[in-house]
Amino acid sequence: MPAQGPSHGELPPADAGRESSPYLELDRSAWAALASEVENPLSAEEIRRLRGLGDQLDLDEVQQIYLPVSRLLSLYVESAGRLYRAQEEFLHQDQPPRTPFVIGLAGSVAVGKSTTARVLQEMLAHWPQHPNVALVTTDGFLYPNAELERRGLLERKGFPESYDRRALLKFVVDIKSGKDEVLAPTYSHLVYDVVPDEKVVIRRPDIVIVEGLNVLQPARVRDDGRTGLTLSDFFDFSVYVDAKTSTIRDWYVSRFLRLRETAFQDTGSYFAKYATLSIEEAMAEAERIWDTINGPNLAQNVLPTRSRATLVLRKDRDHSVRYVRLRKL
């Protein structure tokens, strides 16, 4: 699947090539003004705890960008609740309990989507209407390394085919079916593998955030020409964290060099072999991994799903969000 737009991943203007657009686009100052009178519930210490390696997240970014996002999401959740009650009244019968509101969050490796997911989880839980917010990453649904090796997919880890897509879809379907308890597998970034027999238990939260590279992938076409269900069929809202591809590549290389000095020093790390590399060798290896795995996956599978998102957060080189694009209702 070809990447959409220019090769560097620049978003065209919302009204490019047409008189009107299905998107609203707001620059940073216009977006920040939407929550200027809402108090930021997170302290500087909490923000430091939520920040990922290399992210420049600070109080200003949370106040100006993520507070309006959390308020918008809260409005969507409240609206879904009103629709649930209206449907119950229309049917003249009691319905099963309302199912969790599911948010899909996508974006490239190293773009900061995990930090975005953690911040939104924390902020959404501060709104009194929905205090119970669960976060699940799709990493746990990767096939174990042994299975990836057996299939010849270890060098394509992160590509759509490296995930147990049937299990991931069943997980989200179970959430939206209102099951009292749903289990998700656990992934260890230290050992770079799924943790056997370790599960995350999801017990009917108000909101579930599903974060991962490929969560906005369209349904696959089957051999008989039919298409089945896909994850985004069960999302109530979706977010894509975006930046120029060349910028994300630089962030990935910088993060790799930081990990070489930190997590890779752990002898139990899958990547411990990189700890002894010189800076030049580590940089060359990071660039190789990006150019052969992460970059192609972004171009072929992740970036083309950007237009499927309800909300796009476009970042600048300093990691700050420059503008926001929201799909019109």
From Swiss-Prot:
It holds the Pfam family PRK. Keywords: ATP-binding, Coenzyme A biosynthesis, Cytoplasm, Kinase, Nucleotide-binding, Transferase. ATP binds at residues 107-114. It catalyses: (R)-pantothenate + ATP = (R)-4'-phosphopantothenate + ADP + H(+). Its EC number is 2.7.1.33. Transmembrane segments: none annotated. Residues 1-22 are annotated as: Disordered. It is found in: Cytoplasm. Pathway: Cofactor biosynthesis; coenzyme A biosynthesis; CoA from (R)-pantothenate: step 1/5. GO terms for biological process: coenzyme A biosynthetic process. GO terms for cellular component: cytoplasm. GO terms for molecular function: ATP binding; pantothenate kinase activity. Belongs to the prokaryotic pantothenate kinase family. HAMAP family: Pantothen_kinase_1. This is Pantothenate kinase. It comes from Nocardioides sp. (strain ATCC BAA-499 / JS614).
